[in-house]
Regions:
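...captures the hydrophobic TM-helix bundle architecture rather than a specific catalytic motif
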Residues: 1-274
Length: 275
């Protein structure tokens, strides 16, 4: 990347990509809501996948603009600090999202379900509303919402996927070291291995979801357990999907020689996100 004038903070021109991203989110969320509630609604799946397609176009289009500005030498140290702070806040927002839903899971598991079962100061709830209900976990509540279901064994695909992600953390670290040492071919190999591990994780998670829905009757309708399970694992899957897309972009950039040993925050930011 060329160097911008010291002290001159680059202000980008107006961009339509945020509007495109908003349209993608609207289509995806509306399509997903209809798909979940209406099943095979006429517009549910087409709208959902249209939103996904628009989002991918937005992602690559916006990447292209930012990469072009970087290669044109419009960014200086001030802009670099802004990018770093922006990425940190973005990752922090994801951490808070997960914290909120893990908090909901903890509340349901440790507090609300025992109360409904008559434990603690919630004994009257069981006595007057849900008499006869015995607290257990996992559960879909005293109303048996969604029917009886089974859980996914922890030592099956979940263990495999955990090992895949831990391995990908090692490979992306090796790739970063290869970049800093100027070993471009080794960088591409390790980065490619990380992408392959991420794609394999996504394949197995999709397989896991199909098994949950078709064989275990574990769905979004399976009470508090089903809803929190799919929210947490689904959002994590989205995180891995976005990370895999960004890693793929980084692979092509590295193949074109875009980064140097000392100037590679684009790569570093994706590595932060992946970890």
């Amino acid at each position: 990347m060329a160097h911008a004038t010291p002290g001159a903070y680059y202000i980008p021109t107006s961009s339509y990509w945020p509007l495109v991203g908003s349209l993608a989110m609207i289509c995806t969320m509306v399509g997903a809501a209809h798909w979940i509630n209406d099943g095979d609604g006429l517009l549910a799946r087409p709208l959902f996948f249209t939103g996904i397609g628009i989002f991918v176009v937005m992602l690559f289009g916006w990447f292209r603009e930012v990469i072009g500005e970087s290669l044109a030498g419009r960014y200086n140290n001030q802009v670099d600090v802004s990018f770093r702070m922006g990425m940190m806040w973005f990752i922090f927002s994801e951490v808070m999202f997960f914290a909120a839903f893990f908090g909901a899971l903890f509340y349901a598991r440790m507090l609300s379900v025992p109360w409904i079962g008559g434990e603690g100061h919630g004994a009257l709830t069981n006595l007057y509303i849900w008499s006869g209900y015995t607290a257990s976990w996992p559960t879909n509540g005293p109303g048996v919402v969604g029917g009886v279901f089974e859980t996914i064994p922890a030592w099956g695909l979940p263990l495999v996927n955990t090992l895949l992600l831990l391995s990908s953390g090692v490979t992306i670290t090796f790739a970063h070291h290869m970049l800093r040492s100027g070993r471009r071919k080794a960088l591409l190999v390790w980065l490619g291995a990380t992408i392959l591990l991420g794609a394999t994780f996504l394949y197995y998670q999709a397989h896991e979801y199909m098994e949950a829905y078709n064989e275990l009757n574990l769905t979004l309708h399976s009470g508090v357990y089903g809803s929190t399970f799919f929210m947490l694992t689904g959002f994590h899957g989205l995180h891995v999907l976005l990370g895999t897309i960004m890693l793929t972009v980084m692979w092509f950039r590295c193949a074109k020689g875009h980064f140097t040993r000392d100037n590679h925050f684009g790569f570093e930011a994706v590595a932060w996100y992946w970890h």
